[in-house]
Design a protein with these regions (language model features):
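Short, acidic/polar
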Residues: 220-230, 358-373, 484-489
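Catalytic-core region of carbohydrate-active enzymes that cleave or remodel glycosidic bonds
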Residues: 400-413, 418, 440-515, 580
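Short, solvent-exposed turn/loop segments enriched in Gly/Ser/Thr/Pro and often Arg
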Residues: 241-249, 309-319, 384-390, 413-417, ...
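Carbohydrate-interacting/catalytic domains
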Residues: 1-208, 217-237, 246, 299, ...
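Hydrophobic faces of well-ordered beta-strands that scaffold small-molecule active sites
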Residues: 202-204, 239-241, 306-308, 381, ...
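Substrate-binding cleft/loops of secretory-pathway carbohydrate-active enzymes
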Residues: 316-326, 394, 402-403, 415-445, ...
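Aromatic- and acidic-residue-enriched carbohydrate-binding clefts of CAZyme catalytic domains
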Residues: 197-219, 247-295, 322-360, 521-529
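Active-site neighborhood of glycoside hydrolase catalytic domains
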Residues: 322, 326, 330, 353-421
Length: 664
């Protein structure tokens, strides 16, 4: 609760504001044009009427936008607003005792009871209008209010009743309220308003050195266009590269994470730095910085964006090691420690010490690295393992970058404990990796997605679903064959507005290190030989999914996800609809990659404004087939090999054309 000034006269109480992340410590997230619904409990002793408004503005601007809030039940008030600029904003609720509304209610009660001796009440109304005229700064409004004041002064009870309900008078009084005793919720709550791509985009990740799929030699930046064209043809919006910086020579890893490398082994891109430079340089085997700039330009001319991995690792050959040895961890004998995550050892990587005595210089240098790449056309950063660096650093550096470049997007690659993942999202990361890769059963998916989309997480945690990564090959994909890849693709593409695939997913690559959830012959350690059009690929299926995503607004949101009932534990059924019901999508997916599954799906007719028993049409957007359904209960059959999923567009009956039903 907060008031402008604490006095006995100021008795309006505002509490339980929603959304409000950790008492206002962290901002809510929205995108430009996306609605923010705000509610609060607003109360006052006695029976006086209240006026309540939702206010919002860009941080740093003096003037507020505002809209009236409506009372819903008891003392709960609600309103919604939209933001038109990619910038940080703030919002609050202001409320006050509205003497004119109270007068209107009191007058109506007395007049309705047959009391015609209302001179005192009319005089009171006249005085209220006169005081509002004194507050008005628009000449026309001032004159109109004075005229109403005069009319009330001279009115009889019957004419007074008409004036008390006069919409023009009510509007004028609302425009010039007495705010001398208003209460305002403080501290103001913040909103980060991002551009639309922060919510909706399809990502395609590939290692540029493997762009041509050659086994024994690497590709260069200028060899990447066919791979980018292929991703564009499949409907992807973002091209994402792992690190492109010079790779260390000392302790370079070999194939399959061997501790010894052979001549010609390219090394791990996450071991950044050698004699050719560090985080502000490119690996010479990929080309030059000019080549990189050219490639980013080519990506943008195709209507796509470029995302770059921001990895805070240094090889033993990184220039920082000689220039700033104090930035690293040291053993008792003075030598620099390499990274370890027992039982794993990373001899080719030196982690940075964010608590070193010169930490401010380190932080500034890492900020400069980000700014360097922003100035070279990078608009999105996928941040490697942010959970192993201080939260305070991320909160500071993201704010510093977005202060001048609010369009920059940060994706947190943090597969860690739930609360730490939430913390990273709260303190500024635009998007977050998730546990999606390990959620494969109906119960697991339903529980996890309900948490993401229907709890307070929806206000600050934006998921980005990757079925696989260069580090993760889930068991479901190792064993389920091509159908498993189709199943996971449709789930990722329709459950989350932001999703992506790592190259090779479209080829259904699924050979693991025995007993592990990692790829055998991973291209983290070697050049990857591939036929990009190998038989059995699912490129056409992914192309359809991305086309469906772009054409259906309901799939651009995640808070609208609702799980529905289907009589089979191996089939999952969920819906997404726009608020105006102009776009309604029903998705049914067979979660069993081996067997045909059947069941009755129950369509929530009332949610889509369809009368029970009324006909409606569903079109399978994957095949073009149309089905006329009637009633809640409808039969489905899904073959994982040929039809693992339905993505239905539901159309309601709008009329008849002769004997033909018309759906829209």
């Amino acid at each position: 609760v907060s008031t402008k000034e604490s006095t006995l006269e100021r008795t309006v109480v505002i509490e339980n504001m929603e959304p409000c992340i950790d008492g206002g410590r962290f901002p809510v997230k929205r995108i430009v044009g996306q609605e923010l619904k705000v509610s609060a409990d607003v109360s006052k002793n006695g029976h006086d009427q209240l006026s309540v408004v939702l206010k919002w503005r860009k941080i740093g601007k003096p003037d507020w936008h505002q809209t009236p809030m409506a009372q819903t039940e008891n003392d709960r008030w609600e309103a919604a607003c939209h933001f038109i600029e990619n910038a940080q904003h703030e919002y609050t609720v202001e409320a006050w005792e509205d003497a004119f509304k109270s007068w209107q209610v009191e007058y109506a009660k007395k007049y309705g009871a047959g009391n015609l001796d209302l001179r005192t009440e009319l005089d009171k109304g006249s005085i209220l209008a006169e005081k509002a005229a004194a507050r008005a700064t628009l000449k026309q409004d001032k004159e109109r209010l004075l005229n109403f004041s005069k009319q009330l002064k001279n009115a009889d009870a019957h004419f007074g009743a008409q004036l008390a309900k006069n919409p023009e008078l009510s509007s004028l009084m609302a425009a010039w309220p007495d705010l001398s005793l208003s209460t305002e919720f403080q501290p103001y709550l913040r909103v980060i308003v991002d551009r639309p791509q922060a919510l909706f985009a399809a990502w395609y990740e590939f290692f540029p050195r493997s762009a041509e799929g050659k086994a024994n030699s690497g590709s260069k930046f200028r060899d990447c266009i066919p791979r980018i064209e292929d991703a564009k043809a499949m409907g992807f919006d973002v091209i994402y590269f792992p690190p492109i910086h010079p790779i260390g020579f000392t302790a370079r890893k070999g194939k399959n994470n061997s501790v010894t490398s052979e001549p010609g082994d390219p090394g791990v891109p996450y071991a950044v730095g050698n004699k050719f430079g560090g985080h502000k340089a490119v690996e010479p085997e990929l080309g030059t910085l000019d080549d990189f700039d050219w490639l980013v330009g080519e990506i943008k001319t195709r209507g796509m964006e470029f995302a770059l991995d921001f990895v805070i690792n240094c090889s033993p050959d990184h220039p920082y090691v000689k220039e700033h040895p104090e930035w690293f961890f040291h053993r008792p004998d003075g030598t620099i420690k390499y990274a370890e995550n027992p039982p794993k050892k990373y001899e080719d990587v030196y982690p940075l010490n964010f608590q070193n005595p010169d930490w401010r210089i380190l932080w500034e240098e890492l900020k400069d690295v980000l700014l360097f790449w922003v100035q070279h056309g990078v608009s999105i950063f996928r941040v490697d393992n942010p959970h192993t660096k201080p939260n305070e650093f991320w909160e500071w550096v993201i704010l510093e970058i977005q202060k001048d470049y609010p369009d920059v997007i940060f994706l947190a690659e943090a597969f860690t404990r739930p609360e730490l993942m939430k913390s990273l999202a709260k303190l500024g990361f635009t998007q977050s990796y998730t546990y999606f890769a390990w959620r494969s059963t109906k119960g697991e998916i339903t529980e996890y997605l309900t948490e993401l989309t229907q709890t307070a997480m929806k206000y600050y945690f934006r998921p980005n679903f990757f079925p696989t990564t260069p580090d993760i090959l889930p068991t479901f994909l190792q064993t389920g064959g091509r159908p498993a890849f189709m199943i996971r693709a449709v789930l990722a593409a329709t459950l989350s507005p932001a999703y992506g695939i790592y190259s090779g997913f479209e080829l259904c690559e699924n050979v693991p290190v025995p007993g592990e959830q990692e790829y055998l012959n991973s291209e983290k350690y070697q050049f990857k030989e591939r036929d990009w059009d190998a038989p059995g690929n699912i490129k056409d299926y992914i192309t359809k999914l991305n086309r469906i995503r772009h054409q259906n607004r309901a799939l651009h949101e995640y808070e609208n996800l609702r799980f529905q009932t289907v009589e089979n534990e191996q089939i999952i059924f969920y819906s997404k609809a726009t608020e105006d019901l102009d776009n309604i999508i029903l998705v049914l997916v067979n979660l069993d990659p081996y067997n045909i599954q059947t069941g009755f799906a129950y369509v929530p007719l009332e949610s889509f404004a369809i009368n029970d028993g009324a006909p409606f049409q569903v079109e399978d957007l994957l095949t073009g087939e149309k089905f006329d359904w009637r009633g809640r209960r409808n039969f489905v059959m899904l073959d994982p090999h040929s039809r693992p999923a339905h993505i239905f567009r539901l159309r309601r009956l709008i009329g008849m054309d002769g004997e033909q039903m018309v759906f829209a």
